[in-house]
Amino acid sequence: PEYHLIVTEGTDTEPAYFDEIRKIINNSYRDRIQLDIEGEGDNTISLFEKAKRKAFESPNDYRHVWVVYDTDDFPAEHINKTKTLCEQNTTSDICFHAIWSNQCIELWFLLHFGYYQADIHRSEYWPKLTEWLVNIGEGEYKKNRSDMYSVLRPYMDVAINNAKRLNNINVGRTP
């Protein structure tokens, strides 16, 4: 199978979200693809370095390594440098991908329910998520909730469209 590694900045929320995806992929497509998740709890550039080291030290022959981080309050040059490092270290054998959310993964979660611009403070995301989740009968939002992918999956098309819309108004801006 083709091996993929997802290395996240977060140690709770992001790994829990991606672990649900990992279970689906590894169970459904085990002959074609295998996905591993690592929550590292590090900043942008250091996270890339850890992801690269894990990929090359692993007995798995990773073809794709996904470096996932929030922009938080990191300087834009760190966010852009991580993306550049991914591009510069990609070869015909391994492809590095930088994926970030602005400012945190909870914005991605919110985009499943409506269009939000990133100019609302991240402290407002949790109450809004709880409101939406209660409305659909899924209870309160908690930071390391292990079922978020399953809860959000039916709304994925909405989230993708809202993310594209948000991206389009931010073209050319630093993250």
Positions of PLM-derived features:
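C-terminal accessory helical subdomains adjacent to catalytic cores in phosphodiester-
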Residues: 1-3, 15, 19-38, 45, ...
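Short acidic, Gly/Ser-rich segments with clustered Asp/Glu that frequently serve as metal-coordination loops
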Residues: 10-14
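Short hydrophobic beta-strand that contains or immediately precedes a catalytic carboxylate
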Residues: 5-9
